[in-house]
């Protein structure tokens, strides 16, 4: 009860404060001038394979090909993508690889998602840390510290790859919490002069409105893909001062094995939109670990789920957060 009262206090405070970024950024673009193309959909599927491959290639030796023993990255393997850098953070546990793909002429950074995502959801640890990207910037403490631990290694690998392949484009990707750290990585790598395109799948919100607007406006495209009622992109809550990058590409539910067409992908714009995934409720872990295919199937261990809170209790808590966010946004428009 005390937690709910605290959240209501946050909502009351926010409602009395000017929040221009919400008024300016809540709109749904189901019929955008630039719609989802077949190439976009193809890219969603391809970079998802890189995001999935990070679960079992985060410590692959330099010079070795990206390989997924579970058959979950066949197109990446077909292109013979070669690892040019890999790193595991000893403090935060974050893992990532940098690979070059001569067939597509690109340098790819792929960040591993956490195998303890339910643990993260249950802890409700949503503190922010000041970042130096832009004035007023705040980023989730855990995501920023994870990036800071591996930043030097990734930047060195990217710089070397660029020197060897000066015409290659740049892509950074990640699933789940890996998508969050990939978003932070994109922001800093872009600021350092590498125009990365960003593909994330089931990423949580990463920072405040200053951060979200900064990343959205940087050189380099954002493709933030969400699926059905995946609970992770709804966290941390809007009422806690978090915002998403824009736009969002929503795989609007259906069977887990659904073969989506471009017309079935809904595009929602705005850093605080609740028109796509943000308008859903509940705890649907299967929606989170299924993006075109089952995720983390090549991980060395199965995804464990913390049980300090029952699924029923967690479902109720997530539903409360979502409903509060929707009401908050409604009051701001």
Curated annotation (Swiss-Prot):
Active site per database record = 176 (nucleophile), 230, 288
InterPro entries associated with the record: AB_hydrolase_fold (IPR029058), Fungal_lipase-type (IPR002921), Sec_MonoDiacylglyc_Lipase (IPR051218)
List the EC numbers from the record.
3.1.1.-
Q: How does activity depend on temperature?
A: Optimum temperature is 37 degrees Celsius.
Which SUPFAM superfamilies does this one have? alpha/beta-Hydrolases (SSF53474)
Q: What's known about how pH impacts activity here?
A: Optimum pH is 8.0.
- One Pfam family of this protein, by short name? Lipase_3
Q: A Gene Ontology MF term for this entry?
A: hydrolase activity
Gene3D superfamilies hit by this protein: alpha/beta hydrolase
Signal peptide positions (record):
1-16
Per the record, the GO terms for biological process are: lipid catabolic process
Which UniProt keywords are listed? Disulfide bond, Hydrolase, Lipid degradation, Lipid metabolism, Metal-binding, Secreted, Signal, Virulence
Q: Please name the PANTHER family in this protein's record.
A: ALPHA/BETA-HYDROLASES SUPERFAMILY PROTEIN (PTHR45856), FUNGAL LIPASE-LIKE DOMAIN-CONTAINING PROTEIN (PTHR45856:SF11)
Q: What does this protein do?
A: Secreted mono- and diacylglycerol lipase that allows the use of hydrolyzed lipids as carbon source and might play a role in pathogenicity. Shows lipolytic activity towards olive oil and p-nitrophenylpalmitate.
- Stated family: Belongs to the AB hydrolase superfamily. Lipase family. Class 3 subfamily.
Name listed for the protein in its UniProt record: Secreted mono- and diacylglycerol lipase 1
């Amino acid at each position: 009860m005390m937690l709910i009262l605290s959240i209501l206090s946050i909502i009351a405070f926010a409602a009395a404060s000017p929040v221009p970024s919400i008024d300016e950024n809540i709109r749904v673009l189901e019929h955008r001038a630039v719609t989802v193309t077949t190439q976009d959909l193809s890219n969603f599927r391809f970079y998802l394979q890189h995001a999935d491959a990070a679960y079992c290639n985060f410590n692959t030796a330099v010079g070795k090909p990206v390989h997924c023993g579970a058959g979950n990255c066949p197109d990446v393997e077909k292109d013979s993508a070669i690892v040019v850098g890999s790193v595991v953070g000893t403090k935060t546990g974050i893992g990532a690889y940098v690979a070059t793909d001569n067939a597509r002429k690109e340098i790819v950074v792929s960040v591993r998602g956490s195998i303890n995502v339910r643990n993260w959801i249950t802890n409700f640890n949503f503190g922010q840390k000041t970042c130096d990207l832009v004035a007023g910037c705040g980023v989730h403490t855990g995501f920023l510290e994870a990036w800071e631990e591996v930043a030097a290694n990734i930047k060195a690998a990217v710089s070397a790859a660029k020197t060897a392949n000066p015409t290659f484009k740049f892509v950074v990707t990640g699933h789940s919490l890996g998508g969050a750290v990939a978003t932070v990585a994109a922001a800093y790598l872009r600021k350092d002069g590498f125009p990365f395109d960003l593909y994330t799948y089931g990423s949580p919100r990463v920072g405040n409105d200053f951060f979200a607007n900064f990343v959205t406006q940087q050189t380099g495209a954002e493709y933030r893909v969400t699926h059905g009622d995946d609970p992770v992109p709804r966290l941390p809550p809007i009422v806690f001062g978090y915002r998403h990058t824009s736009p969002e590409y929503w795989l609007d539910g259906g069977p887990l094995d659904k073969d989506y067409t471009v017309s079935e992908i809904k595009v929602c714009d705005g850093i605080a939109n609740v028109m796509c995934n943000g308008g859903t409720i509940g705890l649907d872990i299967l929606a989170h670990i299924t993006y075109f295919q089952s995720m983390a199937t090549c991980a060395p261990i199965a995804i464990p789920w913390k049980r300090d809170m029952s699924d029923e209790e967690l479902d109720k808590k997530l539903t409360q957060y979502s409903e509060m966010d929707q009401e908050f946004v409604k009051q701001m428009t």
